Amino acid sequence: GPDRDEVLGTVRRLYAELVGYPEDVFESGTDLEADLGIDSIKQTEAFARITDHFGIPESAAVDVRLTGYPTVDAVADLVVELAEGRELTGTVA
């Protein structure tokens, strides 16, 4: 699968592009909604761009509840799992 640091960098970049924030606001512990005000609609849009970027099929990501992945680090971990085609655990929020 892809390198996690590379995935994290891409996740941060795509979020930054989508919402118009500088990349450095996306710290590892920063809550996308609570701290940055990025609502679930924007998170879903960002996630679609991210999975598209990494060639992850929509079917693999269809059951993901993004509320369970509130930080860029959590999203990056999820993307690595999906990219490796692992069985997902803990997707139900």
Where in the sequence are the language-model features?
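4′-phosphopantetheine-dependent carrier domains
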Residues: 1-93
